[in-house]
Every structure is written in structure tokens, then in C-alpha cells.
């Protein structure tokens, strides 16, 4: 029966014997590795559970808070939360405790010793000696300071020149003015010793402390009469006559002749109002219509607008004359000098310059230009160049000469002014024609 089931016969048996069976060794190795891996995982989980299970009791806990684990994880990284500022406690020294001694009860009738004062006064003799020593020390210091100042002043005076020209000293501190050089005078014989000494000091110092604005001379002028402090040297002088015209009074007048500062000259004026005595104001001293005779200054600097006028004589209507020795004239408002018209000669200064420039330009344009090379000098080029140079020099000289022309001040007749009385005038009596 078994043979009948063998349908393929011998050929099928040979074919089956030719097939090779797969090896089972890799499958066994894979299964062993998987079992080992699962065993390791199971062992790890089991051992971890057993380890944590031991610490669940209160007796087995380490006592460390749970926050330490978080700190270990952060490893010192602080929180990103800004808290309130911590108050720093300043160091304060501990006060020394003083033990108070309990006052013992004492008998009020028992005499107690007097308490000593905190600071006893030194004896009067010692105090007076110390005060006298301090005063003597101050006195010696002041004497030494004055002695050193005197020695320095003497050295400066010894180095000063023997001849002192006060005009040069004033010109050094004043502005460059031509009139100052003409009016400079040598030192007056009536000058005081203090003025001479001050001038010698300034000359000895030389140019060390130069005052460009002349402030020192202004202070000297202001304090001329205040050098000697204390009582005034002069006493009150009573009125010498009933017919006096005191200093500070004014004589109103009107100019008759005009003034032109191109040349110096004499002028006349007429008193416009009656002038009475200074004490009562009822005694007529100078009647209306009295003539005044004076002169004016023709030296005018650039920018000046006033004319300096002085009056020398008063001629009364009855023919009598009084010399008033150069009293100054002021305008109606009290300003020094007269001011009316000012001619600065601007047209002459700039007009001549413009005219010469136009003439030079016309001559330069009228000369034909050279057609030759620039390196060659022709007659036309030489003529044009000479004309330009000549007119340039003439223009410079003309402008410079016109710049030196002083302004012309003109005061027209009829100008109202006042004569300022600077000295007391005593008249013979009330004026009678």
C-alpha cells in the first residue's frame, strides 16, 4: 500500500533528496538575546522598586527635604524672580552702659562739699601777661610789614629818573590823541610831596603795570580833594558882600556870532535874562543885554561833535567891564560845549576815491589790449601798467589825506546857552544904568 502511494516513483524521491533544510541556530540566538534583554529590564525595574520601597517608612527616610533634589538638578541656577530688596543692617556700636550709683540717703542738714567747676578761670596776672604778649606780637608784625613796604617803595623811587614829566606819564595811560601831546606840561612847582612821590613810583615801575584805559588817572582826578581825611582845612566863609554871584550860578545868553571850527576865532554873545544875586535873588547884578566876549577851540578830533567855548569878559551896557577869566559855556541842558551842525566830509572822502577809481578804470579800458604773446612787453602794455600804478598811488594818497581831515563843527548865530560861574563874583552894587 505504501508503494502505491508513491506516485512519483524514483524520480520524485531523487528530487526530494536534493532540497537543503534551513539552519535553526540564528533563530535560537535571536530568541536567547530577546529573553536576556527582557530579563535585564525586569531585573532593573524590580530592583528600582525594591530600593524605593525601603525608604517609604518614616524611620528609613534620610531627613533631607525634597527641594534638595531640585537644587541638585538645577546645579546652582537661581530662579528668575526679582524679590524685594533686602535691608542691609548698618553697624552700630553698642553704647557703653554707665552704671548709675544709687544716691545714698543723706541727712539734709549735713554740710556737703562744694562741687568743682569744670574749668577754672586763670589768674588775672596771667591773663594780663598773655594779653600784653599778644598785643606786642601784633605790633611787631605791623611794624615789620610797614618797614618792608617802605623799603620796596624806596627801591622803586631810587630807580626812578631824576626828571619827571607828568605830561609823558599821562600820555602813556591816555589814548593816542594829538592834542594831548601839545597840551602836555612838566610837573608844576606847586604840586604836593605826595603827588611827586606817586609820580616817582609810577616812573620807577615803568611799563610793568600799564593802565591802557587810564582808570588810575580817573580815580586820582576824582579823589584829588579827598587825600587828607578828617576835618576840612577850610572853614565856612561868611558872605563878604550883599552883591555876590556864587559859583554854580548860570548866566543865560544867546550867541551873536557864529562858530566854524575850521579856524580858531573870537565870539560874542548877549545876556538874554537879568541875573540877580545868589543870596536873595532880588538885587540886579547883570542886566539883560549885557555883552559876553570869548573864544572857542578849533582842535577837533575824529568823531567829535561839540565845540569847547570859554568866556573871558562881561561888558555891561553902561560901559563897565568885568574879566571872568575863562568861564566855560554849556548848552541849555547843561552839557559841556556847544553842539549844532557836524560836517564829517564823507562826500569829499569817498567821492574823491570813487572819481579816481573811475578815471583809472576808463584809462585802463581805453588802452587797446596787446595781440602778441603774453611773454612780450609792448608799448601799450607798459603804458597801461604805468597808468594803473600811477592812479593807484594817487588814489591811496588822496584817500589818506581826506581821512585825516577833521570834522567841521558849525554853531549858527542865535544859539541859546548858559555861562557856568565857577568862581564867586563880587559886584560893587546893584546895577544902575
Curated annotation (Swiss-Prot):
Region (Disordered) residue spans: 84-124
Protein family: Belongs to the TrbI/VirB10 family.
Keyword Transmembrane helix: yes
Keyword check for Membrane: yes
Record's compositionally biased regions (Basic and acidic residues): 114-124
Subcellular location, record wording: Membrane
Protein name: Conjugal transfer protein TrbI
Lineage: Bacteria, Pseudomonadati, Pseudomonadota, Alphaproteobacteria, Hyphomicrobiales
Superkingdom: Bacteria
InterPro entries: T4SS_VirB10/TraB/TrbI (IPR005498), T4SS_VirB10/TrbI (IPR042217)
GO cellular component: membrane
Gene: trbI
One of the Pfam families matching this protein, by short name: TrbI
Main location: membrane
Organism: Rhizobium radiobacter
Biased composition (Low complexity): 85-95
Membrane topology of the entry: Single-pass membrane protein
Keywords: Conjugation, Membrane, Plasmid, Transmembrane, Transmembrane helix
Transmembrane segments: 25-45
Amino acid at each position: 500500500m505504501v508503494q502505491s502511494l508513491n506516485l512519483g516513483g524514483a524520480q520524485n524521491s531523487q528530487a526530494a533528496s536534493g532540497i537543503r533544510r534551513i539552519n535553526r541556530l540564528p533563530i535560537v540566538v535571536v530568541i536567547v538575546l530577546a529573553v536576556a534583554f527582557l530579563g535585564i529590564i525586569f531585573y532593573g525595574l524590580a530592583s528600582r522598586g525594591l530600593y524605593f520601597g525601603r525608604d517609604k517608612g518614616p524611620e528609613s527616610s534620610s531627613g533631607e527635604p525634597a527641594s534638595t533634589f531640585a537644587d541638585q538638578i538645577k546645579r546652582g541656577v537661581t530662579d528668575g524672580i526679582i524679590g524685594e530688596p533686602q535691608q542691609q543692617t548698618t553697624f552700630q556700636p553698642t553704647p557703653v552702659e554707665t552704671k548709675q550709683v544709687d544716691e545714698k540717703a543723706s541727712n539734709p542738714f549735713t554740710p556737703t562739699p562744694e562741687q568743682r567747676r569744670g574749668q577754672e578761670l586763670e589768674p588775672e596776672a596771667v591773663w594780663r601777661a598773655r594779653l600784653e604778649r599778644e598785643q606786642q606780637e601784633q605790633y611787631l608784625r605791623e611794624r615789620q610789614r610797614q618797614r618792608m613796604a617802605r623799603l620796596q617803595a624806596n627801591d622803586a623811587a631810587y630807580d626812578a629818573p631824576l626828571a619827571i614829566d607828568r605830561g609823558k606819564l599821562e600820555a602813556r595811560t591816555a589814548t593816542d590823541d594829538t592834542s594831548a601831546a601839545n597840551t602836555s606840561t612838566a610837573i608844576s612847582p606847586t604840586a604836593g610831596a605826595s603827588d611827586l612821590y606817586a609820580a616817582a613810583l609810577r616812573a620807577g615801575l615803568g611799563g610793568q603795570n600799564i593802565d591802557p584805559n587810564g582808570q588810575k588817572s580817573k580815580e586820582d582826578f576824582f579823589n584829588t580833594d579827598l587825600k587828607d581825611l578828617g576835618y576840612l582845612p577850610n572853614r565856612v566863609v561868611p558872605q563878604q558882600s550883599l552883591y555876590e554871584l556864587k559859583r554854580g550860578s548860570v548866566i543865560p545868553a544867546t550867541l551873536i556870532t557864529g562858530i566854524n571850527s575850521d579856524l580858531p576865532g573870537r565870539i560874542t554873545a548877549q545876556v538874554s535874562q537879568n541875573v540877580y544875586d545868589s543870596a536873595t535873588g532880588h538885587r540886579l547884578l547883570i542886566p539883560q543885554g549885557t555883552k559876553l566876549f570869548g573864544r572857542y577851540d578849533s582842535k577837533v578830533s575824529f568823531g567829535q561833535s561839540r565845540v569847547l567855548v570859554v568866556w573871558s569878559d562881561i561888558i555891561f551896557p553902561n560901559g563897565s567891564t568885568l574879566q571872568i577869566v575863562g568861564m566855560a559855556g554849556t548848552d541849555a541842558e547843561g552839557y559841556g560845549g556847544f553842539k549844532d551842525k557836524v560836517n564829517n566830509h564823507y562826500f569829499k572822502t569817498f567821492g574823491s576815491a570813487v572819481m579816481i577809481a573811475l578815471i583809472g578804470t576808463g584809462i585802463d579800458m581805453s588802452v587797446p589790449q596787446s595781440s602778441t604773446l603774453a611773454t612780450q612787453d609792448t608799448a601799450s602794455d607798459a603804458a597801461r601798467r604805468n597808468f594803473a600804478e600811477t592812479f593807484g598811488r594817487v588814489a591811496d594818497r588822496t584817500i589818506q589825506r581826506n581821512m585825516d581831515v577833521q570834522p567841521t563843527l558849525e554853531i549858527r548865530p542865535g544859539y541859546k546857552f548858559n555861562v557856568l560861574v565857577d568862581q564867586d563874583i563880587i559886584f560893587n552894587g546893584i546895577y544902575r544904568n
